[in-house]
């Protein structure tokens, strides 16, 4: 008992940690899928790859966090969707390589274990996993007094997926003449928030700006990142997509060239980009140069596909949502991305 009291006096609440584990079990259970072995709480999560039915499996992994969007979740005391952001950032990256997400692990570090709040965070992670078809097979909650303030926490995630070796998407199939199709984003997603916070530093979040179509600012800023897995997987299975770009930090300019060879470029018709109201507000209130917006944000397109012209109609048919023909692949002359 003396040791327990000593640890508690140093700021670590072991009992609260146990409570967190008990609270999250029901959320983790929602994510179970074929291949999961063992139960939550072991030293390592286990997954039986043979259950996927993939003949020549290649594992593809990704890790990410949600950046300073967390600071807005803390500021507005809304923690139930930030976990979905974390999952989205990881699984959208690996789907861009052709991988079906299999499982996910999360890492939460906090200054003080608050079981109710941490349950909300993990519930959001679980919801993201359900949307991605990934099992939440493990994680870590680290209470680190002195490292973080009592109300602060950080969140990171790790996704592992599998692809058929012949269906890996690595940019080698993208050719001149391919059509660029944009899939809508849900909002800012999880990048550019250091700038977003500066632009809206003097706002409470309760404001309904005229550009935001009746929504409160805080609702728009914390809109969870869209997860594209279930929309895009059927396209990968039918081998209809030559390249995929997840539009994250660096916007169009940094991310689109990652899906094709150095001798190619993306020519984008700006008038076809479905720019969301929040980006118009950011440009206006932040006095950001228009061309710079495309270097920072997704501008309304969270995922971009390079598709052979003869496959465009089939892709649209399978997606069953608004699909934006925003450009094409051309031979590179100077820039890798040309926005007209």
Curated annotation (Swiss-Prot):
Pathway: Purine metabolism; IMP biosynthesis via de novo pathway; 5-amino-1-(5-phospho-D-ribosyl)imidazole from N(2)-formyl-N(1)-(5-phospho-D-ribosyl)glycinamide: step 2/2. GO terms for cellular component: cytosol. GO terms for biological process: 'de novo' IMP biosynthetic process; adenine biosynthetic process. Disulfide bonds: none annotated. Its EC number is 6.3.3.1. Coiled coil: none annotated. Its main location: cytoplasm. It is found in: Cytoplasm. One of its GO terms (molecular function) is phosphoribosylformylglycinamidine cyclo-ligase activity. InterPro entries: PurM-like_C_dom (IPR010918), PurM-like_C_sf (IPR036676), PurM-like_N (IPR016188), PurM-like_N_sf (IPR036921), PurM_cligase (IPR004733). This is Phosphoribosylformylglycinamidine cyclo-ligase. The gene is purM.
């Amino acid at each position: 008992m003396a040791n327990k009291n000593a640890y508690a006096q140093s700021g670590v609440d072991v009992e609260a940690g146990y409570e967190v584990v008990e609270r999250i079990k029901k959320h983790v259970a929602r994510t179970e899928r074929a291949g999961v072995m063992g139960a939550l709480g072991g030293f390592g999560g286990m997954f039986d790859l043979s259950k996927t039915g993939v003949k020549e499996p290649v594992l593809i992994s990704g890790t990410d966090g949600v950046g300073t969007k967390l600071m807005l979740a803390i500021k507005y005391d809304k923690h139930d969707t930030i976990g979905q952001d974390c999952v989205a950032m990881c699984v959208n990256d690996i789907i861009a390589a052709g991988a079906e997400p299999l499982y996910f692990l999360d890492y939460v570090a906090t200054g003080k274990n608050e079981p109710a709040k941490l349950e909300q965070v993990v519930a959001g992670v679980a919801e993201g996993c359900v949307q991605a078809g990934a099992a939440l097979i493990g994680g870590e909650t680290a209470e680190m007094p002195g490292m973080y303030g009592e109300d602060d926490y950080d969140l990171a995630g790790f996704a592992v997926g599998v692809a058929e070796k012949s269906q890996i998407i690595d940019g080698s199939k993208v050719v001149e003449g391919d059509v660029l199709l944009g899939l809508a984003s849900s909002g800012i997603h999880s990048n550019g928030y250091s700038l977003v916070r500066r632009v809206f530093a003097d706002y409470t979040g309760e404001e309904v700006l005229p550009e935001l179509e009746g929504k409160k600012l805080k609702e728009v800023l914390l809109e969870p990142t869209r997860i594209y897995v279930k929309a895009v997987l059927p396209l990968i299975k039918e081998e209809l997509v030559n390249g995929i770009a997840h539009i994250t930090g660096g916007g169009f300019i940094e991310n689109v060239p990652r899906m094709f060879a150095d001798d190619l470029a993306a020519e984008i018709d700006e008038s076809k980009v479905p720019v969301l109201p929040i980006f118009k507000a950011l440009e206006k209130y932040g006095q950001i140069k228009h061309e710079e917006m495309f270097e920072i944000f997704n501008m309304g397109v969270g995922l971009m596909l390079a598709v052979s012209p003869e496959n465009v109609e089939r892709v649209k048919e399978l997606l069953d949502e608004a699909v934006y023909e925003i450009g094409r692949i051309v031979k590179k002359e100077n820039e890798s991305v040309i926005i007209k």
